[in-house]
């Protein structure tokens, strides 16, 4: 049986489109087929968090060293702490045939598409409409009206980049969206270009006679 190299599955969407819920549902449905990327961070470990499972915990100096050496592909600063995606883990997973899920914004997604194009499968999750997105954001009751408007403006800008992704899915139902992504993942894993040893198999079992 042929084995395939791992896929780097990148999910992006505006705030309020359900990407985190979809990602968790996908990991539940495909628990033996894909793992979530483990980020490097400079923040202190919280109670119950485990090194290598939740995050890789490093100090600021080490994080900056990793960035300067190209060992961190994409990073951001949040509330004074750095978070980044380690290159080695992704490359190791690809080589081992393990697919990896990344949930990142469009800028981070574009960086991955540029640096690891042959392994990246990018999916943009859309809201059914801007009106529905407004309803969802207001329904969370976590932000005031100014923040909601800012999120909607940002969403429109993010959506304007969706055509650069491999797939666009309108998220009307979490289960259905997760199922669609599961189907995409399985199909991408089976692509001819990702089948390890295909040429050797053809030459050994199906030789062309002169």
From Swiss-Prot:
EC top class, as a word: transferase
Lineage of source species: Bacteria, Pseudomonadati, Pseudomonadota, Alphaproteobacteria, Rickettsiales
Pfam families with a match to the protein in the record: Guanylate_kin (PF00625)
Name under which the protein is recorded: Guanylate kinase
GO cellular component, one term: cytosol
UniProt keyword annotation of Repeat present: no
Annotated binding of ATP, by residue: 13-20
Function: Essential for recycling GMP and indirectly, cGMP.
Single GO term (MF): guanylate kinase activity
SMART domains the UniProt entry points to: GuKc (SM00072)
Keyword set, alphabetical order: ATP-binding, Cytoplasm, Kinase, Nucleotide-binding, Transferase
Compartments in which it is found: Cytoplasm
Coiled coil regions in record: none
HAMAP family linked to this entry: Guanylate_kinase (MF_00328)
Reaction(s) catalysed (UniProt annotation): GMP + ATP = GDP + ADP
The Guanylate kinase-like domain, residue ranges: 6-186
Enzyme Commission number(s): 2.7.4.8
Chain's gene name: gmk
Similarity comment: Belongs to the guanylate kinase family.
